[in-house]
From Swiss-Prot:
Motif (Nuclear localization signal): 289-294
Claim: Lipid biosynthesis is one of the keywords in the record: no
Subcellular location: Nucleus
Gene label: REL
Transferase is among the record's keywords: no
Function text: Proto-oncogene that may play a role in differentiation and lymphopoiesis. NF-kappa-B is a pleiotropic transcription factor which is present in almost all cell types and is involved in many biological processed such as inflammation, immunity, differentiation, cell growth, tumorigenesis and apoptosis. NF-kappa-B is a homo- or heterodimeric complex formed by the Rel-like domain-containing proteins RELA/p65, RELB, NFKB1/p105, NFKB1/p50, REL and NFKB2/p52.
CDD domains associated with the record: IPT_NFkappaB, RHD-n_c-Rel
Gene3D superfamilies from the UniProt entry: Immunoglobulins, Rel homology domain (RHD), DNA-binding domain
PROSITE patterns: REL_1 (PS01204), REL_2 (PS50254)
Upper lineage: Eukaryota, Metazoa, Chordata, Craniata, Vertebrata
Species assigned in the record: Gallus gallus
Designated name of the protein: Proto-oncogene c-Rel
Principal cellular location given in the protein's record: nucleus
Keyword annotations of the record: DNA-binding, Nucleus, Phosphoprotein, Proto-oncogene
Amino acid sequence: MAGISEPYIEIFEQPRQRGMRFRYKCEGRSAGSIPGEHSTDNNKTFPSIQILNYFGKVKIRTTLVTKNEPYKPHPHDLVGKDCRDGYYEAEFGPERRVLSFQNLGIQCVKKKDLKESISLRISKKINPFNVPEEQLHNIDEYDLNVVRLCFQAFLPDEHGNYTLALPPLISNPIYDNRAPNTAELRICRVNKNCGSVKGGDEIFILCDKVQKDDIEVRFVLDNWEAKGSFSQADVHRQVAIVFRTPPFLRDITEPITVKMQLRRPSDQEVSEPMDFRYLPDEKDPYGNKAKRQRSTLAWQKLIQDCGSAVTERPKAAPIPTVNPEGKLIKKEPNMFSPTLMLPGLGTLTSSSQMYPPCSQMPHQPAQLGPGKQDTLPSCWQQLFSSSPSASSLLSMHPHNSFTAEVPQPGAQGSSSLPAFHDNPLNWPDEKDSSFYRNFGSTNGMGAAMVSAADMQSASSNSIVHATHQASATAASIVNMETNDMNCTSLNFEKYTQVLNVSNHRQQLHQAPAACPPVAAPGSTPFSSQPNLADTAVYNSFLDQEVISDSRLSTNPLQNHQNSLTLTDNQFYDTDGVHTDELYQSFQLDTNILQSYNH
């Protein structure tokens, strides 16, 4: 009839090409169902067809044929519902427009059974494309890992017999997932999905079975394509590949994502792609720049913290004053640079606040009882018998060899000096002791001067006789209170009994005898008293550039007041800041020295 189209078969949904495994009959299990092309785990579909330009009953036959032309009947069998002798056949009514095949499975045969299977197809006249029988027996031409579905439709004739055959239609090839050369390519897992833009990163891929001579790793982005580098030895048991990434086509400043997939060159089959990120070239692979930045930030924060602490630091406390009992109130905190600093004390207006006047007592040669006899120690006898200079006192007697024993004050009119310390003289530590042992002048210039340990070695019990209470005691010759070498305080409180000064630029003059000492029997008198105030020793204290001539008193002794009185007994020096205050702390009573000459 003119204008009426002939009926034909159309595939509504193709079978899935990969992912299905062909089963052997001896496995004793179902071969499964061939899924449709769009089948998912949640929505399973199956291969389906429809017959266009026809409405009525139809008989459908589905067989397996080879992949390549001529399409010969395949030795594998279709198994499932409505299947017999290796093929599927069923009748459908006009109510079904789309015909779906849900229970079709593929069952493979052994190589030794290929001839028998082909003979069965010929006997059942299963040859949709009428391939000559001679070609059908050529067993070596069959590919056992791939098949196609062939759909045939038969329409009923006027007698109701299905004799009118429509042209057969074949599906896409279906590959056995068990065969590596036809299996579905799938990346199961990778150890890393990013790498350097320069390439060369080692990547491990776990995959389904592949053939080591028919596989490659491809990187794709738009029109750019590159392949990973590996050899056949890098394919482990067909399920793992170790390769190195190719470099990207250009340098990048930000990460860029490309597609990575497996591809089989023989059939150009590819796997599902996965993302791979190329990272910019790292100029500092070990993170040294970041570490330096962190260190810089840490230092800046530390400096800021220290700066705030310095600005908030309280001012230095005033120099501790000496109370009438002669004890220091408070130590000066160490907050200065490591240079010798000797700030001055100016709290006492006159030396009378520190020392009571030493009045001259008449000589009373009283008999000493046998129970109270003070003699010079053996060390002093040895010292003054040879008349050594004051600078040799330290080497003969260490600074801790004597104790400052303070005699109790006598009757009214006694000139004994008040005791400043009740305990033996102790240096704060060995550092301060060594400093005063080696310190020779106020500014590091001038002649060598007597050390503090020499002055400390004098004992009040050995100098002053028991009957002469007017003799000055040396309970505390030098006091030091320091936290560090930065701030040092010297106290020449009771060293005045061994000094007789008339002029700080001239040699010491020996004072006339006024109060001769009375020694007990067996004691050694002071035969050479000027040795206690050696000229070189005293000049070393006074002959310095830091002493201001205009501030030091050089007036001669008048009205028999043979004493040189300065306003304070402590001095400090901070690199010339208080040099005009230096050595204003000596109170010298020549009557004491005169008493030793008698």
